[in-house]
């Protein structure tokens, strides 16, 4: 297994992955901003919230590298060429919707933090970006694809939950909706294209029934991981689940708060529901 990821096989139809909770900052990162500022990009502690899942037979994949080093939830075409010392030799994304995040500094390799602080005071070589793709992006995506394929082969369907956390209020350079106050959860299926809407509705109803506020496809619809590995017509369902960080941690200090235990219990009940759900019967 690649040292940049942690992957645990499962026996059930359910696959969970956490692409943004990594905290291993490679010496070759050579960032210029403060570490505390950079760490605001993390989905800190998400892997701890779901640490019960592998014991239930759920496949688990997590990135150990930090999101700001390489964002595994982006395509390798989402290149910010303003960061590079030479033209990118591969294809570069041209879709204006996708490129809106690159313009905010949030491409495959981040240029700026959510508050707009520059991450580098240097240009990156094409070779070092290629090395990050080879050592981080490729093994992460291979592990997610393998886990989903294995779940689908065993059961005839797969449910993939792409696990994230979000700040209570959107920062100025984080989304196209700066200053927006987030719900407790945002459930995203890219407008019904990555999962059965009945399955998505079941998740939304379950969380709302537990007393949480739940938004749907706004402001987060899901990005590359749910897009790439979903095919509802073939019973491959992928859903992005965003959790408001104030439910379980102090956003300033990154320390776990007293709400962690109750939130984890809610997530355990959600996982139990999904393990009992066959989307083909919905």
Residue ranges and their predicted role:
Residues 1-160, 165-282:
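N-terminal catalytic or cofactor-binding beta/alpha core of small enzyme domains
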């Amino acid at each position: 297994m690649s040292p940049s990821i942690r992957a645990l096989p499962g026996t059930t139809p359910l696959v969970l992955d956490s692409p943004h909770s990594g905290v291993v900052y490679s010496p070759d990162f050579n960032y210029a901003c403060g570490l505390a500022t950079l760490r605001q990009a993390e989905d800190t502690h998400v892997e701890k919230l779901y640490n019960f899942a592998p014991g239930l037979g759920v496949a688990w994949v997590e990135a150990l590298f930090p999101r700001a080093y390489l964002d595994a939830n982006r395509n390798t075409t989402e290149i910010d060429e303003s960061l590079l010392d030479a033209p990118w030799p591969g294809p570069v994304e041209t879709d204006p919707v996708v490129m809106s995040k690159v313009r905010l500094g949030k491409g495959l390799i981040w240029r700026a933090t959510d508050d707009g602080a520059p991450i580098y005071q240097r240009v990156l070589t094409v070779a070092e970006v290629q090395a990050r793709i080879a050592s981080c992006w490729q093994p992460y995506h291979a592990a997610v694809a393998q886990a989903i394929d294995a779940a689908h082969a065993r059961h005839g369907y797969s449910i993939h939950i792409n696990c994230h956390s979000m700040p209570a209020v959107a920062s100025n350079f984080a989304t196209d909706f700066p200053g927006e106050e987030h719900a407790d959860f945002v459930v995203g299926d890219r407008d019904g294209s990555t999962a059965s809407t009945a399955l998505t509705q079941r998740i939304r109803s379950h969380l709302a029934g537990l007393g949480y506020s739940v938004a749907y496809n706004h402001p987060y619809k899901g990005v590359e991981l749910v897009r790439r590995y979903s095919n509802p017509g073939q019973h491959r369902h992928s859903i992005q689940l965003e959790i408001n960080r104030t439910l379980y941690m102090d956003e300033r200090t990154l320390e776990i708060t007293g709400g962690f235990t109750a939130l984890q219990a809610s997530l355990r009940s959600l996982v139990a529901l999904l393990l009992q759900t066959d989307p083909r019967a919905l």
